[in-house]
Amino acid sequence: MELGPPLVLLLATVWHGQGAPVIEPSGPELVVEPGETVTLRCVSNGSVEWDGPISPYWTLDPESPGSTLTTRNATFKNTGTYRCTELEDPMAGSTTIHLYVKDPAHSWNLLAQEVTVVEGQEAVLPCLITDPALKDSVSLMREGGRQVLRKTVYFFSPWRGFIIRKAKVLDSNTYVCKTMVNGRESTSTGIWLKVNRVHPEPPQIKLEPSKLVRIRGEAAQIVCSATNAEVGFNVILKRGDTKLEIPLNSDFQDNYYKKVRALSLNAVDFQDAGIYSCVASNDVGTRTATMNFQVVESAYLNLTSEQSLLQEVSVGDSLILTVHADAYPSIQHYNWTYLGPFFEDQRKLEFITQRAIYRYTFKLFLNRVKASEAGQYFLMAQNKAGWNNLTFELTLRYPPEVSVTWMPVNGSDVLFCDVSGYPQPSVTWMECRGHTDRCDEAQALQVWNDTHPEVLSQKPFDKVIIQSQLPIGTLKHNMTYFCKTHNSVGNSSQYFRAVSLGQSKQLPDESLFTPVVVACMSVMSLLVLLLLLLLYKYKQKPKYQVRWKIIERYEGNSYTFIDPTQLPYNEKWEFPRNNLQFGKTLGAGAFGKVVEATAFGLGKEDAVLKVAVKMLKSTAHADEKEALMSELKIMSHLGQHENIVNLLGACTHGGPVLVITEYCCYGDLLNFLRRKAEAMLGPSLSPGQDSEGDSSYKNIHLEKKYVRRDSGFSSQGVDTYVEMRPVSTSSSDSFFKQDLDKEASRPLELWDLLHFSSQVAQGMAFLASKNCIHRDVAARNVLLTSGHVAKIGDFGLARDIMNDSNYVVKGNARLPVKWMAPESIFDCVYTVQSDVWSYGILLWEIFSLGLNPYPGILVNNKFYKLVKDGYQMAQPVFAPKNIYSIMQSCWDLEPTRRPTFQQICFLLQEQARLERRDQDYANLPSSGGSSGSDSGGGSSGGSSSEPEEESSSEHLACCEPGDIAQPLLQPNNYQFC
């Protein structure tokens, strides 16, 4: 019977007296109120394991002297039985405590919604009461208010739920748990019970422990047990081929017969060691389990590695050092240490420990090794046997670096070639005719291999420095001398040419400052000034930039980001250019464009798929090409997820770089919401929302056209706006357009807004799991595809500011200030927590149906002061109170107090579940017709930038009262930092 996954937490604890683990507070039960802080502490002789129902907000405190579980905001979902078990000593047993979170609004906590058992087993319906006082009024019903079958025998356990004895196939049904609270009936949601017919089979066996080590004289216990639905089976325990005469204990548990033979040894000796077998058999068959029992003279600790202790890697490579430890008793202390010789610029060592029975695996991660990280790495471990250690020596391989100089020695010309690298490079000299920068052995007049160069320096873990000398007597003019070096990492060369000095002719003295010379100097000065001015203007011109950042490591508040240009590009993404058939331009901007295309053979040979292709303009500069390539590399690095615009392929050879992504038929979320808002007659408030807030808010007036932007890829200004729609090239396209038009007429519901919010949160949680910081989370950067699936896109930020008066140049980077967290605005600090702040602004956009954030407030000193002082926007008219609470938590000035994206996903899914269940929620009403089509095409780069704050009074309905008087001038959502 499966009741859902358990909560399992491990922690090494301090030693205390012999016996079972102890849970504090003591007592079999603990009753608390919702919102209280609950702390459960388990003290044991060694490592312990907690198990119990999965519930939110439990944390494990590694600093406590024992294994401590804490929740600072208890909810009814924390109700359940929690067990603490000592891992290393099965004789010690375990200790339990049952927690009640007494919530009058939630009488039941369901641990599972489906239970499957075999006929004849005990079936547990895990509906737990949250208040022990309710146990006398509980009852069980079948779905639809029907009574439980008269032949069904069941009882209620406050710790486990309703238990049906010897379940029958006829008992398969949906059950509802009921109780009375203050004279009113309180019911749980349904639990589906499925009872399968029993099939005869051999007994199930268990031999514990699976491996055992004891020091001579210690106590030990080996338990052989078997279970079966029928009583007719036998169990024996053997050591080698010898059957052990051990008493048999029988029991009947959970509708199964259980038979146990337990061997207890008070003081083990060497003759007790060996292979033990547990054998159970019946008329159907036999099952056997074996284990190895080892008796040792004393404690031991052995460290080994399958790797060589002398490691060599190239600079920039990554390496994992792995050590296996076999130990009894448990290892108490261990640590990795760097022993030098380079102690400057050392970063904190990153390692993990994997634990099995009497065996440990220690792994040290050395990522992108730097020159200063070569040297000795030392693992030290301790148990009762004492200390043991293992040392790795890491040497870095360097490609050769070469320098050629000339010096006369005793009247003869000598060329010196100084070379550094590791392993020691080989040196070859070549003499070639003429002044050339290339020469091989076939072209060379003479070749000398220096097999014994002079070693100038050979320090451990560092480069070898050598010098090769080529005595040539007299340098020959019109000759080039090459010093070529090579080792296993790479090769390098440098040439030297003799310079011929002819006789100089003295010119007659003339005045330097003649009028002609002065004029020439003046013209040259003007040209230089003009060149500097053009260079300055070019530097000021915004570049196509990559906004996302991927964290390589962090220490405290100090983050180190991966350089995306250094990421590898996997050729598996390469797609033939000839298999792309381009359609209409979806959007064009200052640096490139997004084009609809049909891809033939993408994924499968006969596949035909509509895609979006991002490309640069032919006038793009090298740094912009590098930025697009970086964007391609990072998309391939992140991998696939349903809620991000996924990479499908790329064309990087034989022409300009093309990035092929998913085609999003509904365009960006911002314009989608605004098109829906145009059809709105009034708000549809949820029952949990204040009814007094702006009840006169009836019609959202929006302009008929919005500037379509894609971070510079699809931004042309209002006049050159290209509506992103599917291109009708076939009858199937016309049907597709009809589906989109039909969808356009469907009114929005509150569930739709929750659906968009939850999907974006899931996409952001995926990016956070990949250590990716988006830095531009906004509705304009979320695209919608078939089925209203929201996808996060627009990882690059580049705007067409040349034709947009809303942007003021104050540097070389534009920033979405109204979406940014305070630490990003004032300290230029970007973290996952700053993305959470931006997500809160996006939530506000969604539940205001596409209004501008901070309506009526300009981006100026007043705006910055409001943000710094903790100003928060008012509750949007379509947002329930719970959603607005999420927004407020996202806007906490202290980043560490903001929720994680995983927590946001959980809260939104809970709200969506309640919305689906509550039939009183009404749809957001529509005008009966669609004034805007939802069939706008989208792309990976597709986004839209809203027009700045309109002066309509409807927009001010979402403002704080003090902000309504703020004049609505033309604002600027982006500024330079």
UniProtKB/Swiss-Prot annotation:
Q: Which Pfam families match?
A: ig (PF00047), Ig_PDGFR_d4 (PF25305), PK_Tyr_Ser-Thr (PF07714)
Q: What does UniProt note about where in the body, tissue by tissue, this protein is expressed?
A: Widely expressed.
**Residue ranges annotated as Extracellular topological domain:** 20-515
Gene Ontology CC:
cell surface; CSF1-CSF1R complex; membrane; nucleoplasm; plasma membrane
Per the record, the major location class is membrane
What residues bear Phosphotyrosine in this entry? Y544, Y559, Y697, Y706, Y721, Y807, Y921, Y974
Effects seen without this gene: Mice are born at slightly less than the expected Mendelian rate, and the number of surviving mice is significantly reduced after three weeks. Mice are considerably smaller than wild-type littermates and suffer from general skeletal deformities with shortened limbs, increased bone density, and decreased volume of femoral bone marrow. Mice have decreased numbers of circulating monocytes and lymphocytes, decreased numbers of tissue macrophages, paired with an increase in the number of circulating granulocytes. In addition, mice are deaf and have reduced male and female fertility.
Region listing for Activation loop, in residue ranges: 794-816
**Ranges of Gly residues composition bias in the record:** 929-941
- Record text on activity regulation: Present in an inactive conformation in the absence of bound ligand. CSF1 or IL34 binding leads to dimerization and activation by autophosphorylation on tyrosine residues. Inhibited by imatinib/STI-571 (Gleevec), dasatinib, sunitinib/SU11248, lestaurtinib/CEP-701, midostaurin/PKC-412, Ki20227, linifanib/ABT-869, Axitinib/AG013736, sorafenib/BAY 43-9006 and GW2580.
Localization, UniProt = Cell membrane
So where does ATP get bound?
A: L586, G587, A588, G589, A590, F591, G592, K593, V594, K614
Signal peptide span:
1-19
What's the superkingdom here?
Eukaryota
Q: What is the effect of changing Y544F?
A: No effect on binding to THOC5
- Which of the seven top EC classes does this enzyme belong to? transferase
| Annotated glycosylation sites | N45, N73, N302, N335, N389, N410, N449, N478, N491
Record membrane topology: Single-pass type I membrane protein
Q: Where is this region: Disordered?
A: 921-957
Q: What is known of its domains?
A: The juxtamembrane domain functions as autoinhibitory region. Phosphorylation of tyrosine residues in this region leads to a conformation change and activation of the kinase. The activation loop plays an important role in the regulation of kinase activity. Phosphorylation of tyrosine residues in this region leads to a conformation change and activation of the kinase.
**PANTHER family xrefs:** MACROPHAGE COLONY-STIMULATING FACTOR 1 RECEPTOR, TYROSINE-PROTEIN KINASE RECEPTOR
Subunit and interaction comment: Monomer. Homodimer. Interacts with CSF1 and IL34. Interaction with dimeric CSF1 or IL34 leads to receptor homodimerization. Interacts with INPPL1/SHIP2 and THOC5. Interacts (tyrosine phosphorylated) with PLCG2 (via SH2 domain). Interacts (tyrosine phosphorylated) with PIK3R1 (via SH2 domain). Interacts (tyrosine phosphorylated) with FYN, YES1 and SRC (via SH2 domain). Interacts (tyrosine phosphorylated) with CBL, GRB2 and SLA2.
Please give the name of this protein. Macrophage colony-stimulating factor 1 receptor
UniProt organism field: Mus musculus (Mouse)
